[in-house]
Structure formats: C-alpha cells, structure tokens
Amino acid sequence: MKEHKARKRFGQNFLQDTRIISDIVNAVRPQADDVVIEIGPGLAAITEPLAKKLNRLHVVEIDRDIVCRLKTLPFADKLVIHEGDVLQFDFNGIAGKKKIVGNLPYNISTPLLFKLAEVADDVVDMHFMLQKEVVERMVAAPKSNDYGRLGVMLQYFFDMEMLIDVPPESFDPAPKVDSAVVRMIPVKHRIGKADDFEHFAKLVKLAFHQRRKTIRNNLKELAGDDDLQAVGINPQDRAEHIAPEKYVALSNYLAGKAV
C-alpha cells in the first residue's frame, strides 16, 4: 500500500513512538465490552492496540484516503468507521457510556473540546494528545498565567490531569511544538451547578475578554460591584484570580436577580 502523506489542512501529525503509544493504551485501560471512540485514527498507531483489546472500536476520520486504508487492515472487522468531520459528529448517536481517545488535530482542538463538554454526562473518561500549551491551559489553577476561559469552562465539566509529555520527534512529520496527553474524567460531585449554562458561558467569555483589565471593567455590562461582592469576588481582581466555582456562583446570583 502506498505511503500516506500527512495533510496540513487536516492538522495531521502521525504518532510513531511505540513507548508513547503503549503508555496511552495503558492509560485508557480498554476492556473488551467498552464503548470506545477514537478521533482521528490516522495510520492506526493507537487504533491497532486498542482493537486487539476490544470487541468493537468506533473511529471518526475525515480523510477519505485514511478511511480506505482502515478498511484494508487485518482487524477492520472490529472497526465501525464514521467518515466525516468530528466537529459535526453526533457522539450521542452511539449508545452507552463512552471512552473517547485521540491524537486531536491541533487546529480544531479548542472548539472540539467545547463540543465534547456537551456530552460529558455520557462519558466515562477521555484521553487526548494535544499541544502541551493547550493542556497546561486546561489544567491551570487560578492565579497562574495559563489560567483562562478554556480552563474555567472545562474544569466545570471535568477533572483533568496531564499524564504524558510527548516530544516532537514522537511524530511524523514532527510538529513545531511539544505535545502532552491529558486525562479528562467528568466531575461527579460538582461544587456548584450553573442554573443557566448559556449565561455562565457568556459571563466567563466576557470576564477573560481583556485579561489586563479588572473583573469590574470586563463584566460591567452584566454585574455591578455589589453583585460581585455578594458572591465574594473583589471587583479589583483580574479574571485569572477567580476560581471556577466563583464564576458559577456569580452567574447563578445574576440569573436569580433577573427572575
């Protein structure tokens, strides 16, 4: 079979480091009857060892040439191939609690993570290869430089941990950035639940719109000083100083006032 060339428009960098591949599969801990979805199987580096342990493996792939390759693999009878754009994929269309895994295309990682947050209630866990800088933002704590909108929104849905550092030479072609594997487990006992999630999401987006400004300035169209102080937020603080649960509390307080 002719060699597949990585396509830049699909953000393709193919994992080839056998140690990293083994570490990822061990982290996923696949059991035969698990419902597992792999995003972007590529040249099947993770697909093959997963398929060996599973009765069935769902794969989502946009590249038609790779889809054709997948159909010729010795374990193709174990694969359920979903050809198309993962940003349009209906994860709820696959029954059961799911494990989701993948070497995510870095050019769509943020919108894809937000999409996956919407199906968190039907997920056991997720393991993703991402740009290391993105993982650092996902797991960042308040008062750190990496803490921002992405971290607040994903920490609302998931407990997250950076598991594996992955250097550029682990891929072909080698990306220009370091990568990392993150584990994401849906939060079972949330500190606070947003009464109006759309309002909460809008509030967080506004809060981090201009990082150097105070929370008072960034949220002036939604909240006054009295509102901020009512939930224990100092109006002079910047957005990165405020914990996720404080954003939830503020959103609920403002939503309650509007009723």
From Swiss-Prot:
It is an enzyme of class 2 (transferase). It is found in: Cytoplasm. InterPro entries: KsgA/Erm, rRNA_Ade_diMease-like_C, rRNA_Ade_Mease_Trfase_CS, rRNA_Ade_methylase_Trfase_N, rRNA_adenine_dimethylase, SAM-dependent_MTases_sf. One of its GO terms (cellular component) is cytosol. Its main location: cytoplasm. Keywords: Cytoplasm, Methyltransferase, RNA-binding, rRNA processing, S-adenosyl-L-methionine, Transferase. S-adenosyl-L-methionine binds at residues 13, 15, 40, 61, 85, 103. One of its GO terms (molecular function) is RNA binding. It catalyses: adenosine(1518)/adenosine(1519) in 16S rRNA + 4 S-adenosyl-L-methionine = N(6)-dimethyladenosine(1518)/N(6)-dimethyladenosine(1519) in 16S rRNA + 4 S-adenosyl-L-homocysteine + 4 H(+). This is Ribosomal RNA small subunit methyltransferase A. The lineage of its organism: Bacteria, Pseudomonadati, Pseudomonadota, Betaproteobacteria, Neisseriales. The gene is rsmA.
